[in-house]
From Swiss-Prot:
Upper taxonomic lineage: Eukaryota, Metazoa, Chordata, Craniata, Vertebrata
Example GO biological process: sodium-independent organic anion transport
Alphabetized UniProt keyword annotations: Cell membrane, Disulfide bond, Membrane, Phosphoprotein, Protease inhibitor, Serine protease inhibitor, Transmembrane, Transmembrane helix
The organism of origin for this protein: Homo sapiens (Human)
Membrane-spanning segments: 17-37, 50-70, 124-144, 160-180, 212-232, 293-313, 330-350, 363-383, 493-513, 522-542, 578-598
The protein, known as: Putative solute carrier organic anion transporter family member 1B7
Compartmental location: Cell membrane
Pfam families in alphabetical order: Kazal_2, OATP
Disulfides per UniProt: 412-442, 418-438, 427-459
Kazal-like domain span: 406-461
Length: 640
C-alpha cells in the first residue's frame, strides 16, 4: 500500500491526509479481530485460520484494484478538459489575445459535461475497504504461524524455520518494491490507450502509474498461497514417542474439558476469576512505571519511522524531482537490505555482549540519537522551492512573492485571457516554470512534433535575454545540479540511518518482556502492539498527511470545480515541516530513555540482569524485586 500512496492520491484526486486514512485502514481492520484471534486462535484449527487470512488478504487486494476497471480512463488534464488521447498542441492553452477561451463555460455546462464522467471520484472508499479487509486477513498469519511452527517443529529446528520465514518475508518486501518500481513506470491505463499519445512522463506531478496492477498480482498470489493451508493437519505427524505423549495429554485435556462442562457453576466461577485476573494484570502493567515509559518512547520512536515509510516517496519526488519508480527501486535494493542486516546485527550484539536491561536501553538510546542526528542533517539537504511564475515569483519572473495566493497577472500575459486554475506546466529557457503556455505568454508552438516547444513567449522575454528565442518546452524545469547532489547525500544518509536504527530497534523486542513479570509477558506484548497500531499505524499517516497538505501551493481542480490532489508543494516548507515534526517526536524519546536508564539503575540494587540462558533466574529475580519494591501487585495463578 505504501508503495502506491502517491499514485492513489493522484488517481482519485484526494489529499495526503485522506491517503493517510486509507493507509491506516489496514491497522483498523487488524484491530477489529486481534482480540478474537488472540483468544480463540490457539483453540481452533490454526492452519485453516491462516488459510482464511491469506484468502481475505487476497480478496482485499483485488477489491482495492477494482475501481480501476470502473472509473474510465485517467484524464491528467482535467483542469483544461483536454482528452489525454489527443497529443496535439492545438488543445494546449496558448495565449489568445482578444479572444475568449473555449474553457470559459458556465458552471452548469461544466457540471453537465464533467461531473457525470467523474462519478467514480468516491471510489477510493473501495480501496479503503479493501485495505481494511487485508488488515483483517493479516491478523492470524504471523502469531498463529509462528506458534504453529514453534509447537510442532522438531527440537532445535524451530529457530531455523522461523529464520527462514523472516528471510522470505524480507525477500518478499524487496520483490514488492521491485514490482512497485516497474508498475510505477507503466501508465495507469496501459493496454487501453495508445501510449504514444501520452505527453506526460513519470517525473510529471500528474503521472499515475499502474498502481492497480500490484494489488491485482498480490491478490492472486495470496489466494493461491492460501490453498495449501487448508490441507495441513491440526497436529502434524510426530515421532512415535511424542505421538503417544501427545495422545495421553489429549485424553487428559478431553477429560478436563468434560469435567468443566459437567460443572457449569464452577465454569462460571472460572470465567469470572479469569476476567477479574485479566483486569488486575492489565492494571499491574499500566501502573508499572518502566512499562509505561517504554510504551511512550517506543510509540514516539516508531511514529517517526511510520511517517518516513509512508511519505518518503512523496518527499523525494518533491524535494529532488525523482520519479516514484526510481525511489521504489533504490529503497528495495539498498534501504530494505540495510534494515535486514541491521536487525541481524542487533540480535548478534545483544547475544554477543549479553546486554543487561541498562545495556539494552543504551542500545536503544544510540539508535534514537542516530535517528535524531539524521533528521537534523536532512535540514541541510532541503532544496529551495522551484522557481514557478505565479506561485513563488511574479508572472514576469522578476520578483519573488510572499504568498502564492492571488498573484496578479503581469502585463506580459494580462491580455491572453488565461485560466489561472490550469496546470499544464512549461519550462522557459530562462529556467522558470510557468503554470501553462498561456500564462507564459506563448503564442505559437511546434505542433505535434516531439518535444513540444512553444515560441514567442512574452513572459519569458521579459527576463531581458538578448538575441534569444523566447521559448518554453512542455513540462516542469528540472532541479539544478546542487539539488541533485543533495539527493545522493540524502539517500546515503537514509541507508545508514536505516541500518543503524534497525540495530537499536531490536532491543525493544527484548525490553518489553524483561520489564514485566513472566506471567504478564503475553499481555504486555499484546497491549504494546495495540498501542503501536492504533496511535501509530492509524494516526501517524493522517496527521503527517495533514501537515504535508498545508505546504501545497497548487491544487488541481476537477471538472466539478472541487479541489483534487496537490500538483506542487513548497519544498522548503515541506522539508522543514516534515523533518521538524520528526525531530519533535524523537527528542522526547532521548529524554524518556534517560529516565528509563536512571530508574533501572536505581531499582536494580546492583543485580546482574544480563540476558544469559544460565542466568535467566537471576535476571528474573532482579526484575521481580524491582516490581515488588515498586508495589506492583500481580495476581498469582491461584488467585486468578
Amino acid at each position: 500500500m505504501k508503495i502506491s500512496t502517491t499514485q492513489i492520491e493522484r488517481r482519485f484526486e484526494i489529499s495526503s491526509s485522506l491517503v493517510g486514512l486509507i493507509d491506516g485502514s489496514f491497522e483498523i481492520g487488524n484491530l477489529f479481530v486481534i482480540v478474537f484471534v488472540s483468544y480463540f486462535g490457539s483453540k481452533l484449527h490454526r492452519p485453516k485460520l491462516i488459510g482464511i487470512g491469506c484468502f481475505l488478504m487476497g480478496t482485499g487486494s483485488i477489491l482495492m484494484a477494482l475501481p480501476h476497471f470502473f472509473m474510465g480512463y485517467y484524464r491528467y488534464s482535467k483542469e483544461t478538459n483536454i482528452d489525454p488521447s489527443e497529443n496535439s498542441t492545438s488543445n494546449l492553452p496558448n495565449c489568445l489575445i482578444n479572444q475568449m477561451l473555449s474553457l470559459n463555460r458556465t458552471p452548469s455546462e461544466i457540471i453537465e459535461r464533467g461531473c457525470v464522467k467523474e462519478s467514480g471520484s468516491h471510489m477510493w472508499i473501495y480501496v479503503f475497504m479493501g485495505n481494511m479487509l487485508r488488515g483483517i486477513g493479516e491478523t492470524p498469519i504471523v502469531p498463529l504461524g509462528i506458534s504453529y511452527i514453534d509447537d510442532f517443529a522438531k527440537e532445535g529446528h524451530s529457530s531455523l524455520y522461523l529464520g527462514t520465514v523472516n528471510v522470505m518475508g524480507m525477500t518478499g518486501l524487496v520483490f514488492a518494491f521491485m514490482l512497485g518500481s516497474l508498475f510505477a513506470k507503466m501508465y495507469v491505463d496501459i493496454g487501453y490507450v495508445d501510449l504514444s499519445t501520452i505527453r506526460i512522463t513519470p517525473k510529471d506531478s500528474r503521472w499515475v502509474g499502474a498502481w492497480w496492477l500490484g494489488f491485482l498480482v498480490s491478490g492472486i498470489v495470496s489466494i493461491i498461497s492460501s490453498i495449501p493451508f487448508f490441507f495441513l493437519p491440526l497436529n502434524p505427524n510426530k515421532p512415535q514417542k511424542e505421538r503417544k505423549v501427545s495422545l495421553f495429554l489429549h485424553v487428559l485435556k478431553t477429560n478436563d474439558k468434560r469435567n468443566q462442562i459437567a460443572n457449569l457453576t464452577n465454569r462460571r466461577k472460572y470465567i469470572t476469576k479469569n476476567v477479574t485476573g485479566f483486569f488486575q494484570s492489565l492494571k499491574s502493567i499500566l501502573t508499572n512505571p518502566l512499562y509505561v515509559i517504554f510504551v511512550i518512547f517506543t510509540l514516539l520512536h516508531m511514529s517517526s519511522y511510520i511517517a518516513s515509510l509512508t511519505y518518503i516517496i512523496k518527499m523525494v519526488e518533491q524535494q529532488y524531482g525523482w520519479s516514484a519508480s526510481k525511489t521504489n527501486f533504490l529503497l528495495g535494493v539498498l534501504a530494505l537490505p540495510a534494515v535486514a542486516i541491521g536487525m541481524f546485527s542487533g540480535g548478534y550484539i545483544i547475544k554477543k555482549f549479553k546486554l543487561s536491561l541498562v545495556g539494552l536501553a543504551k542500545l536503544a538510546f544510540c539508535s534514537a540519537t542516530v535517528h535524531l542526528l539524521s533528521q537534523v542533517l536532512y535540514f541541510f539537504l532541503i532544496c529551495e522551492s522551484k522557481s514557478v511564475a505565479g506561485l513563488t515569483l511574479t508572472y514576469d519572473g522578476n520578483s519573488p512573492v510572499r504568498s502564492h495566493v492571488d498573484v496578479p497577472l503581469s502585463y506580459c500575459n494580462s491580455e491572453c485571457n488565461c485560466d489561472e486554475s490550469q496546470w499544464e506546466p512549461v519550462c522557459g529557457n530562462n529556467g522558470i516554470t510557468y503554470l501553462s503556455p498561456c500564462l507564459a505568454g506563448c503564442k505559437s508552438s511546434s505542433g505535434n512534433k516531439e518535444p513540444i516547444v512553444f515560441y514567442n513567449c512574452s513572459c519569458v522575454e521579459v527576463i531581458g535575454l538578448q538575441n534569444k528565442n523566447y521559448s518554453a518546452h512542455l513540462g516542469e524545469c528540472p532541479r539544478d545540479d546542487a539539488c541533485t547532489r543533495k539527493s545522493y547525500v540524502y539517500f546515503v544518509i537514509q541507508v545508514l540511518d536505516a541500518f543503524l536504527c534497525a540495530v537499536g530497534l531490536t532491543s525493544y523486542s527484548v525490553l518489553v518482556i524483561r520489564i514485566v513479570q513472566p506471567e504478564l509477558k503475553a499481555l504486555a506484548i499484546g497491549f504494546h502492539s495495540m498501542i503501536m497500531r492504533s496511535l501509530g499505524g492509524i494516526l501517524v499517516p493522517i496527521y503527517f498527511g495533514a501537515l504535508i497538505d498545508t505546504t501545497c501551493m497548487k491544487w488541481s481542480t476537477n471538472s466539478c470545480g472541487a479541489r483534487g490532489a496537490c500538483r506542487i508543494y513548497n519544498s522548503t516548507y515541506l522539508g522543514r515541516a516534515f523533518f521538524g515534526l520528526k525531530v519533535a517526536l524523537i527528542f522526547p524519546v532521548l529524554v524518556l530513555l534517560t529516565v528509563f536508564i536512571f530508574v533501572v539503575r536505581k531499582k536494580s540494587h546492583g543485580k546482574d540482569t544480563k540476558v544469559l540462558e544460565n542466568e535467566r533466574q537471576v535476571m528474573d529475580e532482579a526484575n521481580l524485586e524491582f516490581l515488588n519494591d515498586s508495589e506492583h501487585f500481580v495476581p498469582s495463578a491461584e488467585e486468578q
